[in-house]
Amino acid sequence: MNKPFIIDAHLDLSMNALEWNRDLRQPLKEINRREIGMTDKPDRGNATISFEELRKGNVGLVVATQIGRYVGPDNPLPGWHSPEQAWAQTQGQLAWYKAMEEEGQMVMIRDKKALETHLALWKDSEPADKKPIGYVLSIEGADSFITVNHVERAYAYGLRAVGPAHYGPGRYANGTDSTGHLNAMGKELLRTMDRLGMILDVTHLCDEAFWDALDLYKGPIWASHNNCRAFVDHNRQFSDEMIKALIERGAVIGIALDAWMMVPNWVRGESTPRGMNCGMEIMANNIDHVCQLAGNANHVAIGSDLDGAFGTEQCPYDLVTIADLQKIFPILQYRGFTDDAINRIASGNWIEFLRKHLPE
């Protein structure tokens, strides 16, 4: 089959640019060469993403993040010591996206018209190396909204999706490895997002906050990068009950490629993808599991999270660059997935969702 057009619903591109100091305009080999000998991050020299590799893989549209965590005095996680600092970080990330737009490397997809224009551009026969990567702007964790009113400011500059939580306790909602119901600020955040017509990303919400959010939120919901608890029994993944509830809400779930979410008993810094037999077949297992629960292929897609503070040391052994996302489709074809189902998983489900829920 031809290379399907891919939408990847979770890439921390600005984090890579500004915290990892990676110039994504450079070839991937050069990005990794400049990190030889560096030890400040666990994934130095193991990057999988550059603009060139996105184009090679026919990944023409992504959901790209802002991220800035606030941590209180008793929170051991890395993060900023005030929401104002976290907000400033996200604004620096926005400035990088704007700089990439001015360079012609990226284009923001704010509304339905921009979406259709961009999809038409990637359908034409011009070589992909001349085409900008489209991005829908999302935020991973809402800590950086100094007040709930800041979400309105963010919507005005193009933010279209919000994940209220990340790891640990958050100002608006508690996330992975944490517990607790949505607080008053979190509920107010959801009401504001609802009024603006924003997309709620339920990825990383702890179980109690997940169910609170589904009850409270009336607008569009997706899970940009989340796998199945049936395979890795950890609160970071969704139980079958959660997946079924999302299917009922018309959500799409993006399957992620962080190895610890793919195989049980992964030990960070010790386990290896080959040693744990973590390959793209595991991604196919997660895709198939959601399809079995849904009875169709309409609610699952790709949200790789590649280079999300991990690289080739902690992703499928048969993926060296993001262009290797294309390897999932022959695996699905071999398992009996139709071309229509494969195209839905590659991008069709995200396209349908965005056509329905982006503003006019």
Set out the residue ranges of the language-model regions.
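Short acidic (Asp/Glu) and glycine-rich catalytic loops that position anionic groups and cofactors
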Residues: 222, 227, 306-309
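Loop-centered beta-sheet repeat module
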Residues: 179-215, 220-225
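Histidine-centered catalytic micro-motifs
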Residues: 6-13, 205, 223-226
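N-terminal hydrophobic targeting/anchoring segments and the immediately downstream early-domain regions
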Residues: 1-179, 184, 233-360
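Short, catalytically relevant binding-site loops at active-site mouths
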Residues: 207-208, 228-230, 259-262
